[in-house]
Design a protein with these regions (language model features):
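Charge-rich, low-complexity N-terminal segments
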Residues: 1-140
Length: 140
């Protein structure tokens, strides 16, 4: 299978409600998102004109408009966290989530959004979201 991957970066802060470790506090990460797609219509010998699965520029535009622009330099907190910390409600760039904004939940959200936005000719085959250099969640 031929797979095309593009890597994206964004900065985001979060906190995990009900967790006893350090991640219960608001803190940020430099996220790295790997998006891998394939075509549902690939010929094993070659790719017909224009010769690529998707233009990297078009993939970048899609990811930036649906994911990066939404989360970059934002604070993402669960409704449960905000219920216990009402003074944060007026923070600029705050995104309220139904669930805890863990790397796993972020990745599942990204999968849902991209699956809905990709054309029928494109198939999402893998996502990897690094929360730190050596810690990440992966969907395959």
């Amino acid at each position: 299978m031929l797979i095309l991957t593009k890597i994206f970066h964004f900065e985001m802060a979060h906190a995990i409600h009900g967790y006893s470790g350090a991640c219960k506090n608001i803190h940020g990460h430099s996220y790295e998102l790997h998006v891998s797609i394939s075509s549902t219509e690939l010929n094993e010998d070659y790719i017909t004109a224009p010769g690529f699965i998707i233009d990297f520029k078009d993939l970048k535009k899609l990811i930036n408009s649906t994911i990066i622009d939404k989360f970059d330099h934002k604070l993402v907190l669960s409704r449960a966290f905000l219920n216990d910390h009402k003074t944060i409600l007026n923070e600029e760039n705050l995104i309220e989530w139904e669930v805890e904004p863990t790397v796993e939940n972020l990745l599942l959200y990204i999968k849902k959004i991209l699956t809905a936005r990709l054309s029928n000719e494109l198939k999402l085959v893998k996502l990897k979201l690094h929360e730190t250099k050596d810690s990440y969640a992966e969907w395959v």
